[in-house]
Amino acid sequence: MTKAELVKELRTRTQASMSECIKALDASENDIEKAIIWLRENGAIKAANKLKNAATDGVTLAKKVGNKAILIEVNCQTDFVAKNENFLAYANQILEEALAKVESKEDFDKLIINGKPIAESGLDLTAYIGEKIVFRRGEILKANDQQTLGVYTHNNNRVAAIILVDGKVEDEVVRNVAMHAAAMRPRYLNEQVVDQVWLAKEREIIVNQLEHEGKPAAFAAKIIEGRLNKILKENCLVDQSYFKQPELTIEKYLKNNNAVAVGYYSYEVGEGIEKAPQMSFADEVAAQMKK
């Protein structure tokens, strides 16, 4: 096999990064079995250095058990590892531990995974896989006897949402709302919880737009309020048009089912993290061969 083919096979078998596979093969005279041993022996030493890297890929997962719904994000560096069974097992382990032990948002940082604090629990997997593996964040919603929880995780594990409503409703109803939330990604549940700093910035943008458009000052205030209301409706879950029945808002859809939304969170993998430019497999091999 060519060096590139050896690298690809070693990466497939070990889930190690491209650069680590090349180093392992170089140190093992291109013997794959010896390279696997080299990776295992050297992984732990290099894991700490991997933690300095940016982990912008990964998964978001949501699940409910009893009166509790949990939403988490666990990160790695590439979509290749995000699909790895060991990585997915680790992420699901965190999810199950959170469902069993988390009672408030602060409890996520107190979780113990495989005998280690959650902040350190990804180190062994980082050593084995060769990419930074880290728990990034989590949210919890809890229901009382007169409330219902809804959860949704998209089938690619890249977006997920949890929702809490007042009222006892069918699971399908709250799952539909959670699915809508995961797809549309509204910033807020309703206008009452809108970040006023964000709202002020949106207003400032509109004012600057009107200046460039040369709109008459007499109409400026009305135009500003109109555009701001439109932005609020687009960014508040309860005011959005329900994607399965666009003639209804989410608020109206829930009202028709005797429910009111009172809690909501959604995650998208890597949101807010600066991402490095992506390379193809061939380009990545070529770049590593030049080192």
Swiss-Prot record:
CDD domains: UBA_EF-Ts. It comes from Ureaplasma urealyticum serovar 10 (strain ATCC 33699 / Western). Associates with the EF-Tu.GDP complex and induces the exchange of GDP to GTP. It remains bound to the aminoacyl-tRNA.EF-Tu.GTP complex up to the GTP hydrolysis stage on the ribosome. GO terms for cellular component: cytoplasm. PANTHER family: ELONGATION FACTOR TS (PTHR11741), ELONGATION FACTOR TS, MITOCHONDRIAL (PTHR11741:SF0). GO terms for molecular function: translation elongation factor activity. It is found in: Cytoplasm. Residues 78-81 are annotated as: Involved in Mg(2+) ion dislocation from EF-Tu. Belongs to the EF-Ts family. SUPFAM superfamilies: Elongation factor Ts (EF-Ts), dimerisation domain (SSF54713), UBA-like (SSF46934). NCBIfam families: tsf. It holds the Pfam family EF_TS. Its main location: cytoplasm. Disulfide bonds: none annotated. This is Elongation factor Ts. Keywords: Cytoplasm, Elongation factor, Protein biosynthesis.
